[in-house]
């Protein structure tokens, strides 16, 4: 027997997840899971990576989100100002894309959450969820959900009100989650309500790391993120220095600290592990496992576009357009006395255009050139060139950079290597006070435009300093 992990946080859940999508997929293969969901907090950033890896390893990807739900996204008051409405501030809820339409709606919900709904966290409300419900599967989520919060306060009428809304809105695509780390009485209430409302129950591990080997790293990241304070007047006894890492953290921050993962098994549990944990709570129902498989079976494949497929099509033959522009520019620059020799430039241009043509990158160069030409025409300051793109003669001839790569001995292969399968990255410095004008132009010109986030990883020296801070080791000792 197996089940499917439907509540999974990767390292894209910043400071709240440790494992990579690949580590989770490898674990799913090891456990015999036919499918696996990704439900990072407030972000869809891990979707493409998990999808690609899951498909390569014959695991069905289920793309989702653990979102933050509120009563009204226009209400941006602090909790202290809400007078008893605190249960409707940042409520967790799991959304899973059932099909391509569901994935499109999931993206739309996320977009609204990060723009109109953002208040410390990306939020959406009941009205938005109802508007974009098509193709969405909803599960009730963790102890921070509206449902569990109501049960914890013994507000049973409120819990039933929420359940009725979700069932009326999503029908059979709404599921109630039970978890091994829920309080036993909460799981009991959830199952009773599910039976009363004829809603299917699924068991979920609410994973934040892939296995127990990552538990210490998870706790370190949590302490960093919550800016935990060492207990006052504590002295670091010699005996504590030789204890386990988790014991040392308990010693420094207290076993009963408000936020900790140390008390829970929140890794991707095997079927036997999760079944054993639920049986300890007196829950022995096979349907909570089989329902995860049934849910996964309802999920259809998605049409995930590759990077090149997303580029706008404005030319019937972008390769020819790029060749025409660069050759015309080369002819114009032949009058410059600094040229090393026309044959050298023509040979280099042929080589670059050939690689760009083989890689199908021409539309990207044309888009960047169009953007920079417009900015310069509007007297917006643009940098002369930065990064590896300065090694491209094509970029120079298009006016993307102002640096002659041959004159300075710069290599094109640092920019685009034909043996690598990555996408070129043209770094462009634009006058910061007028950058929004350029973005607005791109939207007008190409319609479908998105900002891109960059995820930075902990580096060696930074990791040492952060670990030392968590372990209350003076930086003077670290710097020795």
Named regions from a protein language model:
Residues 38-44, 177-184, 209, 310-315, ...:
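Conserved short loop/turn motifs at secondary-structure junctions
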Residues 40, 61, 99, 138, ...:
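A residue-level signal for conserved active-site and pocket-lining positions in enzyme catalytic cores
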Residues 102, 141, 202-210, 380-402, ...:
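Conserved phosphate/anionic-ligand binding catalytic regions in large, soluble enzymes, centered on
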Residues 1-4, 147-148, 194-196, 276-386:
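Non-catalytic structural connector segments
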Residues 217-323:
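Active-site or pore-adjacent capping/gating segments
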Residues 2-35, 41-197, 215-224, 231, ...:
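Extended substrate/RNA-proximal surfaces in nucleic-acid metabolism proteins
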Residues 274, 278, 415-451:
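A structural-propensity feature for long, helix-poor, extended segments
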Residues 395-422:
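Class I SAM-dependent methyltransferase SAM-binding "motif I" and its flanking Rossmann-like core
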């Amino acid at each position: 027997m197996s089940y499917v992990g439907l509540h999974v946080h990767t390292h894209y859940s910043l400071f709240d997840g440790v494992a990579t999508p690949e580590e989770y997929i490898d674990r799913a293969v090891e456990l015999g899971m036919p499918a696996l969901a990704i439900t990072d907090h407030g972000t869809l950033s891990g979707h493409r990576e998990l999808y690609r890896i899951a498909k390569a390893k014959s695991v069905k990807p289920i793309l989702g989100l653990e979102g933050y739900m509120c009563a009204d996204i226009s209400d941006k008051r602090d909790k202290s100002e809400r007078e008893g409405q605190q249960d409707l501030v940042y409520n967790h809820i799991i959304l899973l894309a059932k099909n391509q339409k569901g994935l499109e709606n999931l993206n739309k919900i996320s977009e609204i959450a990060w723009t109109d709904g953002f208040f410390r966290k990306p939020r959406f409300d009941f009205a938005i969820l109802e508007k974009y419900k098509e193709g969405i599967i909803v599960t009730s989520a963790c102890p921070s959900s509206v449902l569990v919060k109501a049960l914890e306060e013994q507000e049973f009428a409120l819990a039933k009100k929420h359940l009725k809304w979700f069932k009326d809105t999503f029908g059979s695509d709404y599921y109630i989650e039970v978890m091994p780390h829920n309080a036993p009485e909460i799981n009991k209430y959830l199952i009773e309500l599910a039976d009363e409302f004829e809603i299917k129950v699924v068991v979920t591990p609410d994973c934040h790391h892939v296995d127990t080997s990552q538990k210490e790293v998870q706790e370190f990241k949590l302490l960093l993120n919550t800016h935990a304070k060492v207990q006052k007047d504590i002295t670091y006894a010699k005996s504590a220095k030789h204890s386990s890492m988790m014991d040392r953290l308990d010693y420094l921050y207290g076993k009963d600290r408000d936020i900790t993962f140390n008390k829970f098994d929140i890794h991707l549990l095997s079927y036997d592990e999760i079944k054993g944990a639920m049986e300890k709570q007196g829950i022995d129902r096979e349907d909570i496992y089989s329902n995860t498989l049934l849910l996964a079976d309802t999920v259809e494949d998605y049409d995930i576009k590759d990077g090149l497929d997303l580029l706008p099509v404005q030319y019937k033959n972008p390769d020819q357009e790029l060749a025409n522009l660069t050759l015309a520019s080369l002819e114009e620059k032949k009058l410059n006395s600094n040229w090393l020799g026309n044959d050298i430039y023509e040979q280099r241009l042929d080589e670059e255009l050939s690689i760009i043509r083989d890689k199908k990158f021409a539309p990207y160069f044309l888009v960047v050139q169009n953007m920079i030409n417009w900015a310069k025409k509007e007297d917006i300051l643009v940098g002369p060139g930065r990064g590896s793109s300065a090694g491209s003669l094509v970029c120079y001839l298009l006016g993307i950079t102002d640096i002659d790569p041959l004159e300075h001995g710069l290599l094109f292969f640092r920019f685009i290597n034909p043996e690598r399968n990555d996408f070129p990255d043209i770094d462009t410095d634009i006058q910061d006070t007028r950058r929004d004008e350029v973005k607005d132009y791109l939207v007008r010109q190409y319609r479908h435009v998105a900002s891109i986030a960059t995820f930075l990883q902990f580096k060696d020296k930074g990791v040492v300093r952060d670990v030392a801070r968590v372990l209350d080791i003076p930086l003077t000792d670290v710097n020795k």
